[in-house]
């Protein structure tokens, strides 16, 4: 549709199923005309989802992927892609972690979200964040927050509500919750 043609979208991608879902959603958005960039915080993204996203024109940066085609980690290039996105604003899909993750985000993921977190709280920043299943870095079952988390404007979760979507302090980082 014409209303999304060229709209900037940033995918924050981890190695689990949420990362795969994020890549697949990004491929659909790119196919629909959005300008989609994926930044990987893993050296092991879901291979089928990654290929699907790339086949639909998603630009990929991060672990194992660089814009020049080299197959090595370039965190500086991935962070630069996040900063370039931030200069335009748009939609972020947070698929860094899911229900299998525990503890705070790993350093590579923290580096990717740092410029976005610094941009401000939901409603006060030039972007909107949709968390895939849960805001990455929140305690899935108990709602703990042990490190930086990119606060979502909306969290789209699957099957049922998780503890982090209902319990403080994580609940305050979820935005509107859709099951």
Task: Label each region the model flagged.
Residues 1-98, 104-132:
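Nucleotide and nucleotide-moiety/phosphate-recognizing core
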Residues 89-179:
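YjeF_N-associated NAD(P)HX repair module
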